Swiss-Prot record:
It holds the Pfam family DUF2448. Residues 1-209, 318-321, 374-625 are nuclear. This is Transmembrane protein 201. Residues 502-515 have a biased composition (Low complexity). Glycans are attached at N124, N259, N421, N528. Residues 469-525 are annotated as: Disordered. It is a multi-pass membrane protein. It is found in: Nucleus inner membrane. It comes from the Eukaryota. GO terms for molecular function: actin filament binding; lamin binding. It comes from Danio rerio. Disruption phenotype: Knockout leads to defective intersegmental vessel (ISV) development, with a higher percentage of embryos exhibiting impaired vessel formation and incomplete extension of ISVs. The lineage of its organism: Eukaryota, Metazoa, Chordata, Craniata, Vertebrata. The chain crosses the membrane at residues 210-230, 297-317, 322-342, 353-373, 626-646. The gene is tmem201. Critical regulator of angiogenesis and endothelial cell (EC) migration. Promotes the migration of endothelial cells, which is essential for angiogenesis. May be involved in actin-dependent nuclear movement. May be involved in the organization of the nuclear envelope. May recruit Ran GTPase to the nuclear periphery.
Length: 651
C-alpha cells in the first residue's frame, strides 16, 4: 500500500488516467447495452371480432387466429384480409354449429302481442335479403356500383307500410336510448380501468440491485470525505484552545479544562471500543483511513464517477431530480478540491468552511438518493370539477362516473326491451295522413353504422323501409318499380315521379374513379359508433310535444335525466338541458372503445393498440428538458476540468 501511495504521489497523471479509463469503460458498457437490446418475443393483441386480448409471438402480430372466436386476424391497409381464405366462398369447408333454441324472454313480447312488422312487410324483407345475397353482377369490375343500384331497386320494390314504418322508427329510437346508456357505462368503465393501469405501470418500476449498490457507494465516498474533514477539525481544536489559553481571562481556562476532561472521557471510550476489535482489523482500518486522508482528491473523483455512472446506467425512465442535484453537488466538491490542489499551502479558512458545507449537503443528498429507491404507489385523490360545455367530457366522466351509470345489466349480452305505448302510437300514426320528411332519418344512419360489409354511400333515408337511400312513399306511390339496369345506365324513369336520391346517383359516378376490386358481399361486419362521421346521434336538442305529434317521430331526442331508463311512458313538454350534448362524447373522445369501433378505412393493426395522444403541459416539458440538461452540463464541466488538469500536469 505504501509503494502504491508513493507511485501515486510521484505520478499524479496515473490517477487522472485511471479515472478516464473508468469513464471510457462505463461509456462502452452503456453503448453495448443499448446496442444489444433484445426485441420483445411476444406481444399482446386484440381481436377485431370479439374484442378479446391474447398474447401471440412478435412475428405473428398481424397474422394470428383468435382462441376465443376462432377468427383470423390479419389485414391489409385497405381493410381486406392479407391472405386468401377459401372458407369464405367454398361451402364444403364450413362446418355447422348447432345450439339449443333459447326461450324468448318476456321483455321481447310487445304490448299488443304482435310482431314488430306485419306479415306482408316481414315477407318482403326476407325476399329482399335473399335477392340481395344471390346477386350476380354483369361485370365483375363494376361490382360495387351494380350492388348499390340493385339495392336501391329492391328498396323501392319492397317498401314498408305506414304503420310498420312508424313502429320501426319508434323501436329504433327506443333501442338507441338503451344502447347509448350501455355505451356510456362501458366507456366509463374502460376509462377507469385505463387510469388504474396507467398509474400502476407508472409507479411500479423496480430499481435494480446494482443501481442501489452504486448509490450506496456514492454515499459512502461522500461520508468518508465528511469524516476526514471532521477529524481534521478535531485535531486542530486543541491547538486553537492552547493559543487562546494565553489570554488574560481566567474563566476560559476553566472551560478548556472541562472540555479537555470530556475529550479524555470520549477518547477512553473509543480506545475501549477499539480494544474489542482484532488488532489486524484495526491496523487495516487505520491504514485505509490514512491512505484515504492523503488522497482525498481520488476519493472525490471516484464518488463523482460512481454517481454519474449510476445515473447513466439507470436510463431516462429512472432519472430523478435528486440524482441530478447529487451530480451537481459532486461537481462542486471536485472544484473545491482542485482549488486546494492549486493553492496547496495558502488555503483560506473560508474556503475550508464552504468545502465542508458543500460536502455535508452532498452527503445528505446521497443518503436520500440511496434510501429512496421506490416511488409512492398511492393514487392521487380525484378532484371534483364542474363540466363546461366547451370542455372534454372524458375528464368529467372519469371523476363523476357513478353519477351517470346506466341502469343496464353488467352482462355482455344486450337484450332490448320493448318500447312503451307502442299500440297507442300505432293508432295515432294511422289516423295521420301527412308526413313530415326529416333531413336525416335515424334508420339510414343506423344502416350506415351497422352494416354487413360495404358501408353504403347513401346520405338520406326518407322512405318507409329499413334500407336507406329511397324516395318518400308519398312521392313514389304512382311511380312503377324501376329497373335497376336503367338506373345504372343513368336514364330517368318514364313516369313523372321524382328522380333517385342524389346520393345514389352520385355513388355511381363517384365510385367509378376509385380502385375497382372484387370483394365478397358479406365481409366482416363493422360497428361504427363515432358520431362525427356517420352522425349516428344527433346533437341539437328539440322539444317534443304530445299535443300535435307528427306522423313520424322526430329524429332529435331530448336527452334529459330519464333518458337512460328502459321504460319511458311519455315525453315531457319542456326542453330539458342535458348534462352532455348528444353525440359530443363520441365526437370528442379520440380513443377507440374497442376493435369493433373502427371502420374499414383504418390502418392495419389499429385494433391491437390504444393510442392516447395528449399534449404535455409546460410543467411536463420543463421536467423533461431541465433535469437532463442540468445533468449534461454537469458532465460536460466535469470532463472539461479533467482535461485541464491532465493538460497542466503532463505539460
Amino acid at each position: 500500500m505504501e509503494a502504491l501511495n508513493q507511485i501515486l504521489i510521484e505520478y499524479p497523471p496515473l490517477v487522472v488516467g485511471g479515472v478516464g479509463a473508468t469513464a471510457v469503460a462505463a461509456g462502452g458498457a452503456l453503448i453495448y447495452r443499448i446496442a444489444t437490446r433484445k426485441k420483445p418475443t411476444h406481444l399482446q393483441v386484440n381481436c377485431w371480432f370479439c374484442n378479446q386480448d391474447t398474447v401471440v409471438p412478435y412475428g405473428n402480430r398481424n397474422c394470428w387466429d383468435c382462441p376465443y372466436c376462432e377468427q383470423y386476424n390479419g389485414f391489409q391497409e385497405n381493410g381486406d384480409y392479407n391472405k386468401p381464405i377459401p372458407a369464405q366462398y367454398m361451402e364444403h369447408l364450413n362446418h355447422g354449429v348447432s345450439a339449443g333454441v333459447p326461450e324468448t324472454p318476456k321483455t321481447l313480447q310487445w304490448v299488443n302481442c304482435q310482431m314488430l312488422l306485419c306479415k306482408k312487410c316481414n315477407n318482403n324483407q326476407t325476399l329482399k335479403i335473399k335477392q340481395l345475397a344471390s346477386f350476380i353482377p354483369r361485370e365483375d369490375e363494376n361490382y360495387d356500383e351494380e350492388i348499390e343500384v340493385y339495392k336501391h331497386h329492391l328498396e323501392q320494390t319492397y317498401k314498408l307500410c305506414r304503420p310498420c314504418q312508424t313502429a320501426v322508427e319508434y323501436y329504433i329510437k327506443h333501442q338507441n336510448r338503451q344502447l347509448r346508456a350501455l355505451l356510456f357505462n362501458h366507456q366509463l368503465r374502460r376509462t377507469r380501468d385505463a387510469d388504474k393501469a396507467f398509474i400502476k405501470n407508472t409507479y411500479s418500476l423496480s430499481t435494480p440491485a446494482w443501481l442501489i449498490l452504486l448509490r450506496i457507494l456514492t454515499f459512502l465516498a461522500c461520508a468518508f470525505l465528511v469524516a476526514v474533514a471532521l477529524s481534521g477539525y478535531v485535531d486542530e481544536s486543541p491547538s486553537v484552545t492552547q493559543t487562546l489559553s494565553g489570554g488574560v481571562v481566567p474563566p476560559k481556562r476553566v472551560l478548556q479544562n472541562e472540555n479537555e476532561s470530556k475529550t479524555d472521557e470520549g477518547s477512553l471510550m473509543w480506545d475501549d471500543l477499539m480494544g474489542l476489535l482484532p488488532e489486524k482489523a484495526v491496523e487495516n482500518a487505520r491504514l485505509f483511513w490514512q491512505s484515504g486522508s492523503d488522497h482525498q482528491m481520488a476519493v472525490a473523483s471516484v464518488g463523482l464517477l460512481t454517481c454519474i455512472t449510476g445515473v447513466l446506467m439507470a436510463g431516462p425512465v429512472r432519472l430523478r431530480r435528486i440524482d441530478a442535484v447529487a451530480s451537481v453537488l459532486w461537481l462542486l466538491v471536485i472544484c473545491f478540491y482542485l482549488a486546494e490542489c492549486y493553492l496547496k499551502t495558502d488555503v483560506p479558512s473560508w474556503l475550508e468552511m464552504v468545502k465542508f458545507g458543500i460536502t455535508s449537503v452532498c452527503c445528505l443528498v446521497g443518503f436520500a438518493a440511496a434510501v429512496a429507491t421506490r416511488k409512492s404507489t398511492s393514487q392521487r385523490r380525484a378532484r371534483g370539477r364542474r363540466y363546461l360545455s366547451g370542455g372534454s367530457p372524458g375528464e368529467f366522466f372519469c371523476n363523476h362516473g357513478p353519477l351517470l351509470s346506466a341502469p343496464v345489466s353488467e352482462s355482455s349480452t344486450f337484450i332490448p326491451t320493448p318500447p312503451p305505448n307502442l299500440s297507442q302510437l300505432l293508432i295515432r300514426q294511422q289516423s295521420q295522413r301527412t308526413r313530415k320528411a326529416s333531413p336525416s332519418s335515424l334508420p339510414g344512419r343506423l344502416n350506415r353504422a351497422l352494416s354487413l360489409g360495404t358501408i353504403p354511400s347513401l346520405a338520406r333515408a326518407d322512405s318507409g323501409f329499413l334500407f336507406s337511400g329511397s324516395r318518400p312513399s308519398s312521392q313514389c306511390k304512382d311511380s312503377p318499380p324501376s329497373d335497376y339496369y336503367s338506373l345504372k345506365s343513368g336514364s330517368r324513369p318514364s313516369s313523372p315521379g321524382p328522380s333517385p336520391t342524389p346520393s345514389v346517383a352520385g355513388s355511381v359516378t363517384s365510385t367509378s374513379s376509385s380502385a375497382r376490386q372484387r370483394r365478397p358481399l358479406i365481409s366482416p361486419a363493422r360497428l361504427n359508433i363515432s358520431g362525427q362521421k356517420l352522425r349516428l346521434f344527433s346533437s341539437p336538442l328539440e322539444p317534443f310535444s304530445l299535443a300535435s305529434p307528427p306522423p313520424f317521430l322526430s329524429e332529435h331526442n331530448p336527452m334529459h335525466s330519464r333518458g337512460f331508463l328502459p321504460d319511458v311512458p311519455h315525453f315531457h313538454l319542456q326542453n330539458h338541458g342535458s348534462v352532455i350534448d348528444e353525440g359530443s362524447v363520441f365526437e370528442h373522445l379520440e380513443k377507440p372503445m374497442g376493435s369493433s369501433s373502427s371502420s374499414s378505412n383504418c390502418h392495419v393493426d389499429t385494433t391491437t393498440g390504444n393510442n392516447i395522444e395528449s399534449k404535455p403541459g409546460w410543467k411536463g416539458f420543463l421536467g423533461m428538458t431541465l433535469w437532463p440538461g442540468l445533468l449534461f452540463a454537469s458532465l460536460t464541466i466535469n470532463l472539461s476540468f479533467i482535461c485541464i488538469y491532465v493538460y497542466y500536469n503532463w505539460r
